[in-house]
């Protein structure tokens, strides 16, 4: 987890600024330590034990704002985790940050709250669809995986444009 946070610091905060992350989880290192202790005591807590993940800022992660990339929701703090977050945490995932998205979850990766997310390979280009922050974060090696949400190529386009693999979930 520390390696990913150091990379984010070097390339997102001090470096070329891809602008793929809205917020970092201030408790990520403590969660990693808790999982290390659990592993020593009884083994893996689940198949994603200790895997750093970025969540598209469209799903609630308790303790982190959910803004939908819009100034309209800049102060929204959810009281609990979204269902998918609960399941991933139960499998041992560590959420290290919230990824940028197209405002209100639509269109290109641009929002009134954070501006535009850039393509990792060409900072003059976009990162793709509304899950572009998730795609750019994984491509930049800011996390081992990310969660996006598919509408109209919202996962597929950022995956292709950022040189990573994306899986479009089935509906339902």
Please provide the spans of the model-predicted regions.
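Short glycine/serine-rich loop segments
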Residues: 80-172
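Short, well-ordered alpha-helical
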Residues: 1-74, 105-106
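Glycine-rich anion/phosphate-binding loops
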Residues: 75-79
């Amino acid at each position: 987890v520390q390696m990913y946070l150091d990379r984010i610091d070097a390339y997102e905060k001090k470096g070329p600024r891809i602008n793929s992350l809205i917020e970092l989880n201030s408790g990520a290192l403590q969660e990693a330590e808790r999982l290390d202790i659990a592993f020593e005591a009884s083994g893996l807590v689940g198949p994603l034990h200790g895997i750093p993940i970025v969540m598209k800022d469209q799903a609630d992660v308790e303790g982190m704002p959910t803004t939908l990339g819009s100034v309209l929701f800049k102060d929204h703090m959810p009281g609990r985790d979204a269902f998918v977050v609960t399941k991933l945490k139960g499998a041992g995932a560590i959420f290290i940050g919230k990824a940028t998205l197209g405002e209100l979850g639509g269109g290109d990766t641009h929002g009134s709250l954070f501006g535009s997310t850039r393509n990792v390979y060409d900072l003059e280009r976009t990162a793709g669809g509304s899950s572009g922050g998730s795609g750019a974060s994984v491509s930049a090696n800011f996390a081992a995986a990310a969660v996006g949400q598919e509408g109209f190529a919202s996962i597929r386009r950022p995956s292709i444009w950022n040189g990573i693999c994306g899986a479009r979930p089935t509906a339902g």
